[in-house]
Design a protein with these regions (language model features):
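The AdoMet/dcAdoMet-binding core of the Class I SAM-like
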Residues: 1-78, 82, 86-96
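Alpha-helical structural signal in soluble globular domains
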Residues: 14, 98-102, 126
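A generic structural signal for alpha->beta connector loops
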Residues: 19-21, 74, 103-105, 144-146
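Conserved Class I S-adenosyl-L-methionine
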Residues: 89-110
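Soluble small-group transferase modules, centered on the S-adenosyl donor enzyme superfamily
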Residues: 105-151
């Protein structure tokens, strides 16, 4: 799915060196995940409106919720984001918090940690495994029990 129909030809010519084998859909990503009735094993979000800018309508809770709805029950969402490599700016913190408000805990890999600009890969599952996580405290510390159960 890409909003620009010319992307298919560019991808086939410069990256694939052959015709794309899958279906290409020229449509806005948000409109697609909102309107589709199909369910996918994976949704990859790799969208930019400029070198370091993601379109505003693709960073909202509503977009991420629609992307999750487009997944099969055991599906995975992978997002390639451009953020600061320290994850310290309000934009980086807020975008990651928005994604995790929909998906729960996600894996986050900063490719150039500490740099002003970095690719940040986020991996989330449509149905995270296990029961809700508990917080260890001095009053209720079950860490040793959890370690034994895990082994």
């Amino acid at each position: 799915v890409d909003i620009d129909p010319a992307i298919r030809g560019l991808a086939e010519q410069h990256f694939l060196k052959d015709r794309a084998r899958g279906e290409f859909i020229a449509e806005d990503a948000r409109r697609f995940v909102t309107d589709t009735t199909r369910r996918f094993d994976a949704v990859v979000v790799d969208v930019y409106s400029a070198r370091m800018s993601i379109p505003a309508h693709l960073v909202t809770r509503e977009f991420w919720a629609a992307s999750r709805q487009a997944l099969k029950p055991d599906g995975v969402m992978l997002a390639n984001l451009i953020l600061d490599g320290r994850l310290a700016t309000p934009y980086a913190r807020n975008l990651l918090a928005t994604i995790e408000s929909v998906y729960g805990r996600c894996g986050i890999d900063v490719l150039h940690r500490g740099q002003a600009v970095s690719n940040v890969v986020v991996v989330c599952y449509s149905n995270p495994a296990g029961a809700p996580a508990a917080v260890y405290s001095d009053e209720r510390n079950r860490a040793d029990t959890d370690v034994i159960r895990a082994n």
